[in-house]
């Protein structure tokens, strides 16, 4: 059994190669292809949360996969946007929600929201990193935490 430090060093030594291995996994490839093919069709908050695969992909990318079931909560967070300091998401202490709303800021950007790189490739990059961390954590939780 490889210890936490050694596992972490193996992954971190060539993070690019590690991410390439993750992106080559069949399930990751399928979900990423679906996301990139369909995210451009999303024009509203409702469109995003109604497409279960797109919403789950975006949530996982931001480390929020455990909250995918809470669609009403996420709709409330997105409807308030991030520009108003009194908005719902700005009152939350977990930065992941703010990052999610920033990436999918329909309040500020309207229908153009999903045309931005941070919503397309930026979300894919985060998804790959999150998947890498989760996969590493399956065998050693310490490695997942170190990669985070």
Model-derived regions: residue spans:
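General marker for long, soluble alpha-helical cores
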Residues: 1-48, 53-148
């Amino acid at each position: 059994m490889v210890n936490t430090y050694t596992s972490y060093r193996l992954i971190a030594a060539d993070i690019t190669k590690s991410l390439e291995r993750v992106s080559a996994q069949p399930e990751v490839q399928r979900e990423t292809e679906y996301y990139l093919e369909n995210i451009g069709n999303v024009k509203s908050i409702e469109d995003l949360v109604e497409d279960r695969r797109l919403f789950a992909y975006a949530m996982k990318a931001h480390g929020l996969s455990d909250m995918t079931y809470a669609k009403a909560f996420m709709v409330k967070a997105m409807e308030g946007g991030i520009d108003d300091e009194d908005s719902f998401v700005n009152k939350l202490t977990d930065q992941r929600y703010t990052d999610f709303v920033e990436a999918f800021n329909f309040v500020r950007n309207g229908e153009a929201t999903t045309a931005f790189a941070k919503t397309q490739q930026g979300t894919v990059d985060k998804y790959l990193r999150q998947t890498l961390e989760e996969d590493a954590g399956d065998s050693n939780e310490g490695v997942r935490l170190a990669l985070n």
